[in-house]
Structure formats: structure tokens, C-alpha cells
């Protein structure tokens, strides 16, 4: 809805307050609970402050201070995302497939346009994990899995990285990331 700066402490406080995460690909914040005038649009993973409830709507405050109403079914509490006990790979695969057909945009990280690392970071965000922004950063976390010709070592939800191996004259260069979804198939944004 709007760009705003947050300190580390403010980000930690998100789970202590009534903040919600938008869980649909697209949506709207309405000026009133009658859904007659649009304040702004929403995309998957937008974080908004919940200030009240009216029937089937949440009253919300946007980062820039504007207020409005959002349908309750489109919002989950931040705590429900970040207090998960395990990674649900079935949910990762299901959500990954909802991005089929979304336009590629270098640096994109929304359901309107997305790049490879924006794609993987959104999928893992909904599992309560915050990945670094770029593929070259994401590869530094997790556990290395040996590759073979038929992908039998991979599990659904594994991140697959692409690039150039290190040589004597140049370092390794990671330039792309995707997610393994099973049966020898991976999904990515390109």
C-alpha cells in the first residue's frame, strides 16, 4: 500500500500487535465497510495494522496513515505465520502454482510482477521464514544437497540454484533460484 521505513524493533513488534498479512493475490482497501470507494489496492504479503472489526470487514491502518476496510477472509494475523512449528511443503507447492502466469520483473516481489528470488522469498515468508532478497544471498543458508541426474535427492520445497561454478580466475556466481516441487519438476520465475 505504501513504502515506509521500519526499525528492527518495529519489525519485532509486528507479532506483539494486531497486524495482518494479506493472503490473496489481489485485493482492495475500501473507504468504508460498504465497499463503495477504493482507497488502494493490496497484493499478496502486504502487512497492515488491524484497528477494528465490523461485520465481515477489518478496519485497517496503512503504513502511510490512511485508513480503510478489508474483507476478513483476505487477512491472517502475523502471529499465525511467524509462530508456525514446521515448514508445510504442500502449501509451498500449492502457493507456488498460483504464481503461474504472473509477469516477470527484475526486482519484483509481488503477485503483480516478480523475479526468481522475490518468488522464493514470498513462498517461504508464508512459512514464517524470511529469506534474503537475492538468489546470491539465499544460497548462503540451508543445507547443500548433492545433485544427480534424476533429482532423487531433492524434496519438495528445496531451493535450486543456478549460475556459474568457481574457477581459478573467477568466484562462484549464483544468478537464479527456483523451487523443487516433486516428480523431477521445479518452478521458477524467469
Indicate where each model-derived feature is located:
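Boundary regions of SH3-family modules and the immediately adjacent low-complexity/disordered segments
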Residues: 1-23, 53-54, 58-95, 102
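...with weaker cross-activation on analogous glycine-rich loops/strands in unrelated enzymes
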Residues: 131-190
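Sec/Tat-exported extracytoplasmic proteins
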Residues: 100-104, 123, 127-131, 164
Amino acid at each position: 500500500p505504501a513504502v515506509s521505513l521500519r526499525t528492527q524493533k518495529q519489525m519485532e513488534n509486528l507479532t506483539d500487535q494486531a497486524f495482518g498479512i494479506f493472503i490473496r493475490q489481489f485485493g482492495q482497501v475500501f473507504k468504508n465497510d460498504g465497499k463503495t470507494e477504493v482507497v488502494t489496492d493490496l497484493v499478496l504479503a502486504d502487512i497492515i495494522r488491524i484497528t477494528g472489526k465490523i461485520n465481515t470487514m477489518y478496519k485497517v491502518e496503512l503504513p502511510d496513515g490512511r485508513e480503510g476496510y478489508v474483507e476478513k477472509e483476505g487477512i491472517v494475523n502475523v502471529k499465525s505465520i511467524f509462530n508456525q512449528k514446521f515448514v508445510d511443503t504442500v502449501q509451498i507447492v500449492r502457493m507456488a502454482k498460483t504464481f503461474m502466469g504472473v509477469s516477470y520483473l527484475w526486482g519484483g516481489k509481488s503477485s503483480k510482477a516478480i523475479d526468481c528470488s522475490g518468488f522464493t522469498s514470498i513462498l517461504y515468508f508464508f512459512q514464517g521464514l524470511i529469506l534474503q532478497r537475492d538468489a546470491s544471498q539465499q544460497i548462503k543458508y540451508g543445507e547443500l544437497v548433492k545433485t544427480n541426474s534424476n533429482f532423487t535427492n531433492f524434496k519438495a520445497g528445496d531451493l535450486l540454484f543456478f549460475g556459474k561454478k568457481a574457477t581459478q580466475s573467477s568466484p562462484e556466481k549464483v544468478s537464479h533460484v527456483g523451487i523443487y516441487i516433486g516428480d523431477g519438476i521445479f518452478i521458477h520465475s524467469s
